[in-house]
Amino acid sequence: LDDIRARTQTSKSQLFHYFPDGKEQLLLAVAEHEAKMVLDDQQPYLGALTSWAAWQRWRDAVVDRYRRQGQNCPLAVLMSEIGRTTPGAQAVTSALMRKWHDEIATGVRHMQTQDKVAAGLDADRVAAALLAGIQGGVGVMLATGDLGYLEAALDVGIESLRNEG
C-alpha cells in the first residue's frame, strides 16, 4: 500500500476512504479492471461474431493481445497476490469467464441463424470448449513463452465450428 500511496500521491486516509477493507479490496478493484481489459481488448470483434471473417478478426485480436502481453499477465499476478481461492478472486474470475463465454456463445448462435453452423450444435458447449482452449493456450504461453498453443487452440476450434456448417 505504501508503494501505491507514493505513486498516486495519496494519503493513507484517502486510500482507506475508497478502500476501507485495505489491500485485498484495492487489489480486487484492480483485478476487476484488468479482467474488463481482457474483454475490451477483443472488441469490437468479440461482440460481432457474425461471419467467418469476423471470427478470424476476433482470433487475431486474441492472439495479438497475448503476443503484446507476453509472459507478464497482470491479472495472474494480481490473483496470485490476492489468492485465487478467495471469494473475491473467484468472483472476478467467474464474472470474466461468464461474460467471455456468453459473447462466444452469442456468436455461435448468430452463425446458426445464418445456417453457417449446424443448428443442432450446443452453442454453450462450443463456447466452453473454445474458452477452455484459449485458457489452456494462454497457460502454456505464460509457462513457456510459446504462443503456438493458443494459436492452435483457436484455429482448430474455429475450423471445427466452420466444418459443422
Predicted feature descriptions by range:
Residues 65-68, 110, 130-148, 160-165:
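Amphipathic C-terminal alpha-helical segment
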Residues 27, 54, 67-88:
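Amphipathic alpha-helical segments used for helix-helix packing
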Residues 85-87, 98-126, 161-165:
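Hydrophobic alpha-helical bundle segments that form small-molecule/ligand-binding pockets
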Residues 60, 94, 98-101, 105, ...:
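Conserved terminal C-lobe alpha helix of the protein kinase catalytic domain
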Residues 31-38:
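Short, basic, alpha-helical segments at the C-terminal edge of helix-turn-helix-like DNA-binding modules
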Residues 40-71, 123-130:
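Hydrophobic alpha-helical connector segments
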Residues 1-29:
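Helix-turn-helix
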